[in-house]
Amino acid sequence: MNKRLWLLNPLLLATTLPTFTALAADDDNIVVSANRNHRTVADMAQTTWVIEGQEIEQQVQGGKEFKDVLAQLIPGIDVSSQGRTNYGMNMRGRAIVVLIDGVRLNSSRTDSRQLDAIDPFNIEHIEVISGATSLYGGGSTGGLINIVTKKGQQDRQVDLELGGKTGFANSNDHDERVAAAVSGGTDHASGRLSVAYQRFGGWYDGNNDALILDNTQTGLQHSDRLDVMGTGTIEIDEQRQLQLVTQYYKSQGDDY
């Protein structure tokens, strides 16, 4: 399957944007934006979790896929078997909505590819709100997952990530991963540009026989993923901020 996603998300916010406290020891200081009204966790009436990017990165570097990381870190969430699709994913038996920077990914086609829309390298943190909400339309009786992307900072920074995984069963069973990002800015403007690529090998059983692809759900075997993302932030004044997020995402499997 060949999938391409373009995401253009200009945000003009007329309210003060508090800084997300990535290393806050007290959850009361963490600000949640998924409810379209910036509030701390302590002020939220619904059960809320904020998963920091550092936790996600540790799980991904351990060889887990993104949706398996969510199942590990979010209480009550149930995901389907390994593959691109998140068909059947629910929170305590009810449907959920997936967003990137507040933009809803679930479409009327319900193609179950919402979690195959961003590389974990570009995730700052994830906000999870449990329970029904009407802010983003239908299909969110179980809650919502808002993926917040990394933004540029004033200090110049370069990030590089290399990784791999193999089962030592076959020359084609290894995964390869490389990602890089550069960011920087001034007191009034900042930006970040990143490229992340991952190649998935095949799966083999104990007899070194290849496991057959699940064509109905599009498994990750023999596929590659490319995520190119650019973000920019302009501080208009103390109370207004302009953000631009643009993304090219491609997830494609080989013909096996």
PLM regions and their residue ranges:
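Extracellular loop and loop/strand-boundary signature of outer-membrane beta-barrel proteins
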Residues: 110, 164-168, 212-218, 255-256
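A beta-strand signature from Gram-negative outer-membrane beta-barrel systems
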Residues: 118-161
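N-terminal periplasmic "start-of-domain" segments of outer-membrane beta-barrel proteins
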Residues: 27-61
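Extracytoplasmic beta-strand/coil segments of soluble accessory domains associated
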Residues: 33, 67-104, 124
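Transmembrane beta-barrel wall of Gram-negative outer-membrane proteins
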Residues: 171-201, 209-252
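Transmembrane beta-barrel architecture of outer-membrane proteins
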Residues: 65, 113, 140-142, 163, ...
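Outer-membrane beta-barrel pore domains and translocons
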Residues: 35, 131, 161-167, 196-200, ...
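Short acidic/polar hinge/loop motifs at secondary-structure boundaries
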Residues: 103-130, 230
